Amino acid sequence: MGGAMEAGAVERITIVGAGLVGASIALALRRAQPGCRIVAVDPDPAVREALVPGIADEATDDLAAGLRDAQLVFVACPVGAMPAVLEAVARLAPADCLVTDCGSTKASVAVAAAEAFGVDSPRFVAGHPIAGSEGSGPAAARADLFDGRIWLLCPAGPAQEKAAARLAELLSRLGARVESIHPAAHDAMFAEFSHWPHAVAFALCAA
């Protein structure tokens, strides 16, 4: 990586997928770094209309245009779309741009990222902000959505660990508590969590 992700130097940020999480990232960035330029990429015209003004400086459905001159990219699209989106972002984004995702599963994203960017590429760090809301879409977005919430980064190797350290500085300014975990360990942990509601329900029925 070049100097694009040095602390305080990120001025041009692109968010791919501007639902609740993507739009909240934009608002948190505006709060933390008022001078940065935020471009949102989303295929839904209603979403794009809701973003400008106020949330993003520009909203487009053209990925190539949205990635032009970006220093940092947040990919906040559905996990199922991640392989195709990461492949396109890897091809179209500037070579010194850092890319991270916001998906809830990480092992499959790590595989897709390795195919798109290369194994342990310093251009990509998998991520998972543990934050949500009852609402959805940009109308429910909040600048404080990540305040005090854990944001997991999942570097897959030494090069990504260095990139993750730089990214963590920015995420901390968004209010998040940043922790690192291996992609496979992340998925194993959340798979275990997913069993808990079923176990509780079973126990209640058996009581």
Please give the residue ranges for each predicted region.
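NAD(P)+-binding Rossmann beta1-loop-alpha1 motif at the extreme N-terminus of oxidoreductases
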Residues: 2-62, 68
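Short secondary-structure boundary/capping segments
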Residues: 5, 64, 91, 116, ...
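Residues at the starts of beta-strands that form the adenosine-phosphate
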Residues: 12, 37, 123, 150, ...
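Conserved short alpha-helix immediately C-terminal to the canonical SAM/SAH-binding motif I
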Residues: 45-47, 81, 106-109
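Rossmann-like NAD(P)-binding element
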Residues: 63-93, 97-100
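Rossmann-like NAD(P)(H) cofactor-binding subdomain of soluble oxidoreductases
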Residues: 85-139
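Internal alpha-helical scaffold of NAD(P)-dependent oxidoreductase catalytic cores
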Residues: 145-207
